[in-house]
Curated annotation (Swiss-Prot):
Residues 13-157 form the HTH marR-type domain. It comes from Bacillus pumilus (strain SAFR-032). Homodimer. This is HTH-type transcriptional regulator Hpr. The keyword Repressor applies. Residues 186-206 are annotated as: Disordered.
Length: 206
């Protein structure tokens, strides 16, 4: 088989891709186990929890957006969203100007469950945190994995990374670290934070 000339060494590319594949597989095995143990008390699977996570961030996402940002097939996104609707965690809707797409949104029960899941998170039971602990001890923070994020951006696009970043900034904004637990901010604190953010933006404009 003829290969067109590449701007890099083919053997180097092979070793890189296989190194990434095998490390990702090993890492995913640990992450999958941690994730399943975390959500097991709520009788959720990983796809269902991921859908709740995305629905919380997007506040009215279409099924196609859930599939795109959840890295799953559209039928998978729809079927698991339907199960979450049956359990009262999601509500489905159509838009008057867009009858083709189905949109989902968290119900009060779904939002409460999402909050409880974050509050129940225990880093002591998380293999990925334990594995990164020595790096945190040395540098005072967890790895930022910037090179990995650059690769993902080049594969999945800027929109994907914008939602990815937004999801974590929303958690930063809406939740507190309180006595070793992640807890939802009170409405008073949220209003105060929103006011401060608006004031900061106004000052930047001036």
């Amino acid at each position: 088989m003829n290969h067109s000339e590449q701007p890099f060494d083919v053997k180097e590319a092979l070793l890189f891709s296989q190194r990434m594949a095998q490390l990702s597989k090993a890492l995913w095995k640990s992450i999958e186990k941690d994730w399943q143990q975390w959500i097991k008390p709520y009788n959720l699977n990983i796809n269902e929890h991921h859908i709740l996570w995305i629905a919380y961030q997007l506040k009215g996402a279409s099924i196609s957006e859930i599939a795109k940002f959840g890295v799953m097939h559209v039928s998978t996104a729809f079927n698991f969203s339907k199960k979450l609707e049956e359990r009262g965690f999601l509500k489905f809707s159509k838009k008057l100007n867009d009858k083709r797409n189905t949109y989902i949104e968290l119900t009060p029960k779904g939002e409460e469950t999402f909050h409880k899941l974050l509050e129940d998170y225990d880093p002591a039971r998380t293999g990925i945190v334990k594995g990164a602990q020595p790096l945190h001890d040395i540098y005072g923070k967890f790895p930022e994995i910037l090179e990995m994020m650059c690769i993902i951006r080049n594969i999945y696009g800027e929109d994907f990374m914008e939602i990815f970043e937004k999801s974590f900034s929303n958690i930063e904004k809406d939740f507190l670290n309180e006595r070793g637990r992640v807890t939802k901010k009170s409405e008073e604190l949220e209003d105060s934070a929103d006011a401060a953010e608006k004031a900061a933006k106004a000052n930047q404009i001036v």
